From Swiss-Prot:
MF-aspect GO terms: ATP binding; ATP hydrolysis activity; proton-transporting ATPase activity, rotational mechanism
Organism the protein comes from: Bos taurus (Bovine)
Phosphothreonine: modified positions: 136
Chief location: cytoplasm
Protein name (Swiss-Prot/TrEMBL): V-type proton ATPase catalytic subunit A
Activity control mechanisms: ATP hydrolysis occurs at the interface between the nucleotide-binding domains of subunits A and B. ATP hydrolysis triggers a conformational change in the subunits D and F, which induces a shift of subunit d. The c-ring is subsequently rotated and results in a continuous proton translocation across the membrane. The V-ATPase is inhibited by bafilomycin A.
Lineage: Eukaryota, Metazoa, Chordata, Craniata, Vertebrata
Residues of the signal peptide: none
Keyword Translocase tagged: yes
Amino acid sequence: MDFSKLPKIRDEDKESTFGYVHGVSGPVVTACDMAGAAMYELVRVGHSELVGEIIRLEGDMATIQVYEETSGVSVGDPVLRTGKPLSVELGPGIMGAIFDGIQRPLSDISSQTQSIYIPRGVNVSALSRDVKWDFTPCKNLRVGSHITGGDIYGIVNENSLIKHKIMLPPRNRGTVTYIAPPGNYDTSDVVLELEFEGIKEKFSMVQVWPVRQVRPVTEKLPANHPLLTGQRVLDALFPCVQGGTTAIPGAFGCGKTVISQSLSKYSNSDVIIYVGCGERGNEMSEVLRDFPELTMEVDGKVESIMKRTALVANTSNMPVAAREASIYTGITLSEYFRDMGYHVSMMADSTSRWAEALREISGRLAEMPADSGYPAYLGARLASFYERAGRVKCLGNPEREGSVSIVGAVSPPGGDFSDPVTSATLGIVQVFWGLDKKLAQRKHFPSVNWLISYSKYMRALDEYYDKHFTEFVPLRTKAKEILQEEEDLAEIVQLVGKASLAETDKITLEVAKLIKDDFLQQNGYTPYDRFCPFYKTVGMLSNMIAFYDMARRAVETTAQSDNKITWSIIREHMGEILYKLSSMKFKDPVKDGEAKIKADYAQLLEDMQNAFRSLED
């Protein structure tokens, strides 16, 4: 939002636009003489003009949550109404930028103040007015054309990855009386003028949108394309869709942040919005340090990942109230890129801190607390946030589809999944990637527990798999069965040892170990394994399940004959094959390429069939 354009206390002539501070309690300020103010209206509090938002009105008293440190505000200080809700600026310049929770650009503030701290009451516009952008109007638009909300009327090449489509704000329409010719313009220049019912309106490349309002769409569509993360355990066993909602709950040190960062690095999304909401500051600085160095290959060209990423940083040492705003800022930015027809992923790390901010404000308002002191409306607030995800048909012309996928990390205290935030989140989201402390302690990463996690998008994706990877669905079912059987056998093994098991059960145990150690486990810090394309995932799983089927068949068919094949015989004769199976993951998709990896896996399958044939003979 352009805070420099908001009214200032010293410029006001009439005292009627002022209220006065009546009481201060942490981030919550009460003000009197506020008759005529609206809910969620922005106000400037005190002589240092702190940004705040009205969250309750009673008579002429307003309760305000202030997004900055309130020390020094005293009773009788002026409170200025702005007449606007908390809004964000949407236009060229968002990609690659880093904002705080109320969309103030941190790099601009730092260059202005020459300090590592944000001063109070700072006035900076969210999108720079000095940068010139190369604007190209759409070919089919000319003076006299009719245009409605959501129509694309121009294109700005923001960078080599993102074509920024300039859209008419959703609530406007009219006849074009002027459209700017191709050329360089800054974000305050008029590029379009419309006339509707005799009233003329001018538009620049920036539109302002209130964060608590959902951006309108033509219709919501069912999701049908997977969100590929590059993590085998997630893509194979618990897939999410583009336009889906996912929760990653886990205790500290389980690797939530690593999973959400690898999602933003390697997923098949066009745009990434990463919201660090109340997490440690050094995690955000790690993102800022790593992302500019990370590259991705697009059409043979190497590009920086930062070009498709926007960061909203609201770390744990920033004021609490702005945490609540940062989630809404992030989702509004995501919806804006969705309306252009892009597939957007939004990472919220972590929604627990957001809920704690709600709890603190609710406590200061003396509202009735519910479970664990959280407000009674916690579930409704979480739902209203997650429901803004989805695949949609965008408003306006030309026709286009976009999607917003939300991945919310949840940090339950002590890893307790019965915590109110976790249980409320699980009631809303469709995919649950549960992280396990025990797996993390065994250094098994990503530490997704394959027994408690689930995805409700399996059915929605069947059509996609049938079309592109026909053999995949039965493989996944089989792998899950093997892992479940292994869990059931684990108790027996602890009591009586492995030796007393049936031969087929021994095979189940060994293949489950193979799947766990060499398929589900993945080292995110190695070049060959930090990202696993889906064809490699399917190829690896297919060979492991083929080995399981052949071994079981060999044992079952020779069980009655004299020369019985047992698991120990198979292991003795197939040392080489087992070694090759467990080293399938070392194939580097970047160096070796798809064709070579597929050929190697097919060769391994052939070697396996020959080895079993010679064993049975």
